[in-house]
Amino acid sequence: MKKIFLGSLLILLAGYANAQINNPVKWTYTAKKIADKTYELHMTATIDGNWHLYAQDAGEGPEPTTFTFTANPLIKFDGKIKEVGKLEKSYDKNFKSVSKYYGNKVDFVQKVKVKSSIATVVKGTVNFMVCNDRQCLPPRDVPFTINVGGK
């Protein structure tokens, strides 16, 4: 009985550890009002340990971080997405090229204007890839929703 219990416990712990390794990026999404009917959308990635997330202009080889937004007639996008964080640029052994990426944390900021005073949402998907010194995980698509406007 003890062997079965210990075996089950080890399998559960290994599965938990593997799940943590396979999801080294946590995303948060917020909207910050900066003027009347004008907001900044903050799509913030917190990156675990020695992993790094590639920039929107990642360089040759790695999959860059991209955002795709669902059309919303109440939202007008103003400019390009800005990256706020410590951008690193170095030779990437995984791709044998110079790459641009972020470790620890990066905030992707998109300015939007709301065409009405009623609350609405911005929906989209972020596609990203993470690597460490030994391996890369396949690119992932993560859908998100950000509440914007209203009172």
Spans of model-derived segments:
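Extracellular/lumen-exposed scaffold segments
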Residues: 18-151
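Sec-dependent N-terminal signal peptides
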Residues: 4-13
